[in-house]
C-alpha cells in the first residue's frame, strides 16, 4: 500500500484488471501502453474512472508514445511492471536520477529480458529485476498457447481466409514460433520454420514442421509471420523472394520486424483494401499484403490473448512485484522462485477443479538405498 507502481503493458481489458488489482491493494498506479498501436481507448478511460493515472491513446504515433512513457517516468515510480523494458530503458537513458531510485522491475517479454540482461552486462542495472517471462507459468502458456492462438486467430479474422492447405513461413522458433506453428498445423496449414539457431531448427524438424532457409520458405509462403524479436526480419533484400499475394504479419515484440517503410519505397502503388490490410504493388507486378501495418497483429489487429492465459502471466507479474516490494530479491536479473511458479500453477488447476495426487511412501527414489545412510 502507498507504493508507486508504473504499469507499462498493452492497455486492454485483461491488463486493465492487473492495474486495478494493484490499485485496490493500495498502490498508486500509473499506466501507459507498451506499444503505440495496442491501447484500447475505452479501457484507458475506464481505468481513469477507477482512479488510475493513464498516459496512452491508441494510434497516436511514436512521438506521442515517447512523451507518454516519459510522463510515466516523471511520476518517479518505485516499481515497474514492464513489457519490452520500454519504460526501464528510457528511464536509464533519459531519466538517470529517477532510474537510480527505482526499487525493482518485473519484465513480461523475451525481448525485454534480453534488453535488461544487456543493461546488467554493461553494469547499468542498480536494482533487482524479476524476469517474469522466464517463469514457467508465463512462457510455457502465454508465449506458446496465447500468442499461438491469438496470432492465427487475428490473421484469419482480418483476412477471412482458410488456413487449411496454406504454406506459412514462421520466422523464429522460440516459444512464440512454436505456438504459432502448432496452431497453423492444427488448422490444416503447413508451417515452414526459419531459424538461425541450429538447435531450435532441429527441434522444429523433430516436431514435424518443414525447415529451411528464408529464401526457400518465402517462395512457398502464402502467409509470412515474423516472431524473432529483432529488427528487419523481412527487409528490402527479401521482397523479391515473396510470391505474389503473400500476406505478411508480425508476432514479434514491435513493428520493426517487417520493414514496411522499405516496402512502401519499393512499391509502385499502395492502397488500404480493408481495415487492417494494406496492399503494395511491386514493380514486377506482384502484390504483397501487410496486416496491421506490421504492428503486433494479435493486439493491433485483434483482441490479444484470452483471459484464461493472461491470468497466469499477470499472476506472475503481480506476485513478482510483491516479492520486489518485500525487498528479498537481489540486484540483477532474477528468475521467480520455482515454488511460486508451482503455487501459481496449482491455483490455476484448482480453478478448473483439478487437484493433484502426491507421492506416496515408498515411491520416491531414496539415495540412501544406493549409497547407504549419511555417515
Model segments located where?
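Glycine/serine-rich phosphate-binding loop and adjoining beta1-alpha1 elements at the start
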Residues: 1, 31-166
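Adenosine-phosphate binding glycine-rich loop
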Residues: 2-4, 12, 33, 127-165, ...
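Glycine-rich phosphate/diphosphate-binding loop of Rossmann-like nucleotide-binding domains
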Residues: 9-27, 142, 146-221, 226-228
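A short helix->loop->beta-strand "cap" motif at the edges of active sites that frequently abuts
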Residues: 26-27, 52, 97-100, 125-127, ...
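ADP-ribose/adenylate-binding Rossmann-like module
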Residues: 33, 79-84, 95-111, 230, ...
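Structural alpha-helical scaffold elements that stabilize or flank donor/cofactor-binding regions
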Residues: 72-73, 216-217, 241
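Alpha-helix C-terminal capping/helix-to-coil transition sites in glycosyltransferase folds
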Residues: 75-76, 219-220, 244
Amino acid at each position: 500500500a502507498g507504493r508507486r507502481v508504473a504499469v507499462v503493458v498493452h492497455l486492454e481489458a485483461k491488463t486493465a484488471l492487473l492495474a486495478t488489482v494493484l490499485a485496490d491493494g493500495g498502490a498508486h498506479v500509473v499506466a501507459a501502453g507498451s506499444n503505440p498501436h495496442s491501447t484500447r481507448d475505452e479501457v484507458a478511460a475506464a481505468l481513469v474512472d477507477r482512479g488510475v493515472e493513464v498516459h496512452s491513446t491508441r494510434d497516436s504515433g511514436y512521438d506521442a508514445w515517447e512523451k507518454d512513457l516519459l510522463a510515466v517516468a516523471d511520476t518517479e515510480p518505485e516499481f515497474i511492471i514492464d513489457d519490452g523494458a520500454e519504460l526501464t530503458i528510457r528511464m536509464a537513458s533519459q531519466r538517470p536520477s529517477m532510474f537510480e531510485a527505482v526499487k525493482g522491475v518485473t519484465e513480461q517479454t523475451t525481448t525485454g529480458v534480453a534488453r535488461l540482461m544487456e543493461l546488467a552486462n554493461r553494469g547499468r542495472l542498480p536494482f533487482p529485476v524479476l524476469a517474469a517471462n522466464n517463469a514457467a507459468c508465463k512462457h510455457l502458456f502465454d508465449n506458446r498457447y496465447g500468442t499461438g492462438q491469438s496470432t492465427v486467430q487475428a490473421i484469419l479474422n482480418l483476412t477471412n481466409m482458410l488456413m487449411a492447405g496454406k504454406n506459412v513461413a514462421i520466422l523464429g522458433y522460440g516459444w512464440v514460433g512454436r505456438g504459432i506453428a502448432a496452431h497453423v498445423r492444427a488448422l490444416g496449414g503447413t508451417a515452414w520454420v526459419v531459424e538461425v539457431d541450429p538447435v531450435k531448427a532441429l527441434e522444429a524438424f523433430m516436431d514435424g514442421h518443414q525447415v529451411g532457409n528464408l529464401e526457400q520458405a518465402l517462395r512457398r509462403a502464402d502467409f509470412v509471420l515474423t516472431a524473432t524479436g529483432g529488427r528487419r526480419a523481412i527487409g528490402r533484400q527479401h521482397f523479391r523472394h515473396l510470391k505474389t499475394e503473400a500476406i505478411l504479419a508480425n508476432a514479434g515484440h514491435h513493428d520493426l520486424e517487417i520493414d514496411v517503410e522499405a516496402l512502401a519505397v519499393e512499391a509502385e502503388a499502395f492502397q488500404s483494401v480493408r481495415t487492417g490490410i494494406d496492399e503494395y504493388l511491386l514493380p514486377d507486378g506482384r502484390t504483397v499484403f501487410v496486416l496491421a501495418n506490421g504492428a503486433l497483429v494479435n493486439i493491433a489487429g485483434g483482441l490479444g490473448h484470452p483471459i484464461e492465459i493472461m491470468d497466469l502471466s499477470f499472476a506472475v507479474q503481480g506476485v513478482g512485484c510483491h516479492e520486489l516490494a518485500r525487498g528479498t530479491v537481489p540486484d540483477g536479473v532474477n528468475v521467480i522462485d520455482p515454488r511460486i511458479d508451482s503455487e501459481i500453477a496449482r491455483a490455476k488447476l484448482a480453478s478448473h477443479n483439478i487437484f493433484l495426487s502426491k507421492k506416496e511412501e515408498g515411491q520416491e527414489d531414496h539415495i540412501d538405498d544406493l549409497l547407504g545412510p549419511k555417515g
